[in-house]
UniProtKB/Swiss-Prot annotation:
Key words of the record: Cytoplasm, Nucleus, Proteasome
Family label: Belongs to the peptidase T1A family.
Source organism (scientific name): Encephalitozoon cuniculi (strain GB-M1)
Disulfide bonds: none
Name listed for the protein in its UniProt record: Probable proteasome subunit alpha type-3
Primary role: The proteasome degrades poly-ubiquitinated proteins in the cytoplasm and in the nucleus. It is essential for the regulated turnover of proteins and for the removal of misfolded proteins. The proteasome is a multicatalytic proteinase complex that is characterized by its ability to cleave peptides with Arg, Phe, Tyr, Leu, and Glu adjacent to the leaving group at neutral or slightly basic pH. It has an ATP-dependent proteolytic activity.
Subunit structure: The 26S proteasome consists of a 20S proteasome core and two 19S regulatory subunits. The 20S proteasome core is composed of 28 subunits that are arranged in four stacked rings, resulting in a barrel-shaped structure. The two end rings are each formed by seven alpha subunits, and the two central rings are each formed by seven beta subunits. The catalytic chamber with the active sites is on the inside of the barrel.
Any GO CC annotation of this UniProt entry: nucleus
Any Pfam family hit: Proteasome
GO annotation terms (biological process): proteolysis involved in protein catabolic process
């Protein structure tokens, strides 16, 4: 091995961390995930590379009040999902209250960041979008492979993320939409960035998250929405 070759946890002469950049690039090639904050909740959406006839592969419950959608290496994602659930349960058992969204994102972000600096490790190749509540208001947060945590109105990771994020920022109305309207608009935006017709209904996972209800849209309901959009 070339001892002069930069290790995965050291900076290059240009001040870059190549392995972190590679991990972020890997996420940008994975199945698309989108989150959007609405007047009555948060929409989480995931696009699978192949049809899914079994359990959800993109959207997961982390606690009674926090759900997530993930993008990147599946094994890495399952490890971080397990870690997040454990930390959320630890907070509940120790303090008797649900783990706040910001706190859980901090825990996951710190774990991700630690793997960018320890020798013999590599970054987690996965990004998460989290739906929850902050100070009584619906919120969408993220953690990326570097461990950075952010709060968003709308955000996308994965394939076609640049075009979709541009659309979320520039094409969506400033006024808040309800989850039903936002779901249709997100599907329209997704359809502009990639092929998306009724035959892709079984590749989509959609969650409507609110304080009172967490609803996974069944495939036949997603199919109906895509047929209506495709007909216009």
């Amino acid at each position: 091995m070339d001892d002069n070759k930069p290790k995965s946890n050291t900076f290059t002469d240009e001040g870059r961390l190549p392995q972190v950049e590679f991990a972020i690039k890997n996420v940008s090639r994975a199945g698309t995930i989108i989150g959007y904050v609405c007047s009555d909740g948060v929409v989480l959406m995931g696009v699978n590379k192949e049809p899914t006839n079994g359990p959800m592969e993109k959207i997961y419950q982390l606690s009674d009040s926090i759900y997530c959608v993930l993008c990147g290496l599946f094994g890495d994602a399952m490890e971080l999902k397990r870690y997040a659930r454990i930390k959320a349960q630890e907070v509940l058992e120790r303090f008797g209250v649900e783990c706040p969204l910001t706190t859980l994102c901090k825990f996951v972000g710190q774990r991700k960041q630690a793997f960018t600096q320890y020798a013999g490790t590599r970054p987690f190749g996965v990004s998460f979008l989290y739906a929850g509540v902050i100070d009584g208001k619906y919120a969408l947060m993220s953690t990326d492979p570097s461990g950075t945590s952010n709060r968003w109105k709308g955000m996308c990771y994965g394939e076609n993320e640049e075009a979709i994020n541009r659309g979320l920022k520039n094409d969506f109305p400033e006024d808040e939409m309800d989850m039903k309207t936002a779901t249709v608009e997100i599907l329209r935006l997704l359809g502009k960035a990639r092929e998306l017709g009724p035959k892709e209904a079984d590749r989509l996972e959609i969650l409507h998250f609110s304080k009172d209800c967490k609803k996974y849209l069944p495939c036949d309901e997603v199919l109906k929405l895509l047929e209506e959009i495709h007909a216009k």
